């Protein structure tokens, strides 16, 4: 890279607004920015290398005589719900194209009539009568994709839904206690992890309105007017005036860029080169264990600390146990970027309805990692100080520093646009080792209803579990923390070419082990 940091792209709102296409006046389009530029890189996006998956496991509460549930019945109702969702959130039907610039062009065209809209909805929902789980279907999707000419494939759609259950056919009535995995496959370009959950929750709530209704008529929607519901261009939605950004913004941006490059060349786990199938493994704590961990964090570290602070610290401690670095000095540090929901920096009234990507980042910096290790130069006695306050304190200090900036979203938009250009020129930025990457997504209950319920209040299906995961193409372990019904879930997303399942799950268990210490 050299000693001089690259110049950040200028944030120009006029370059990223919705406008009519010169090729087809029916099409609205805008230039991607920030994380959209990263996950929208043409080669990666066509290959689905950042695709998102959300998996909800539904269980029938009882056999209803008034509403005999089957996969076909659920498919028909979901199709109608999707029509309403497309009208309210057209992001779910956007497309992408590319030109000679790195950031993609995001496009939207209204359906010409109800029939075209219904055809789109029907093509978005699929039935799988199989003993496979949602995870199995995801692996099948990705396995088939690897057998194709990936560079010339059509990119993934914004959303495709799979209804998966072990029944004989789609008409078969679901018995009491039967499970249905609802797998949502999304192109990351059109959503981030928060808006993907927002959309899924909205979809399930719309399904609640329709599921006990005998009406099969299409909802009356005035197609053509829904384009006004597209999320506002993010630069126009910022609370701050980007024209007023000055030296402080530039200095913080340079600090962030420097940290990104430090991450590419810093401490990490050894990986094997190559690109294979994406994989995900899960570790779920019970609700009792999760509450005990949270209480332990508050008691040991202080009421202002969260389970997210602990989890990020545990990722670093687990890394030290796995790699057992020799000859650490007091100057050795751990640096890693962490994605952050950017909606807090949007204007009031826009944050709760922004479905396009709205993501920035914070830089986690833990000083003197030697101090986290006992018996550093004695292999037999090597072990991290897993009960020490320091890593959690450093994590919180990093969080507070970056999240307190009023311009943090603007900073992330500029830096991530720059990073997309860097990754286009350097598709493999890591050399031999890569630092594990931590993401905290919070409580899924904020977005997803606990059950599928009729308008009369009858619970037809409970949502027993909900988990989010994504495809991983870069050679780092992505550790995600989320929860469902008070039970915390740690997941690891990785690429099979870079790590074996044994290596990935070993690391995940190390993270969970150190977090559980705080429950004791």
Curated annotation (Swiss-Prot):
Its EC number is 2.3.2.-. It comes from the Eukaryota. The keyword Acetylation does not apply. Transmembrane segments: none annotated. InterPro entries: CAT-like_dom_sf (IPR023213), Tri3/Sat12/Sat16/Mac1 (IPR009992). Disulfide bonds: none annotated. Pathway: Sesquiterpene biosynthesis; trichothecene biosynthesis. The keyword Transmembrane helix does not apply. One of its GO terms (molecular function) is acetyltransferase activity. Keywords: Transferase. Residues 1-23 are annotated as: Disordered. Residues 12-23 have a biased composition (Basic and acidic residues). Induction: Expression is positively regulated by the cluster-specific transcription factor TRI6. GO terms for biological process: mycotoxin biosynthetic process. It is an enzyme of class 2 (transferase). Trichothecene O-acetyltransferase; part of the gene cluster that mediates the production of the antimicrobial trichothecene harzianum A (HA) that plays a role in Botrytis cinerea antagonistic activity and plant defense priming. The biosynthesis of harzianum A begins with the cyclization of farnesyl diphosphate to trichodiene and is catalyzed by the trichodiene synthase TRI5. Trichodiene undergoes a series of oxygenations catalyzed by the cytochrome P450 monooxygenase TRI4. Belongs to the trichothecene O-acetyltransferase family. This is Trichothecene O-acetyltransferase TRI3. The lineage of its organism: Eukaryota, Fungi, Dikarya, Ascomycota, Pezizomycotina.
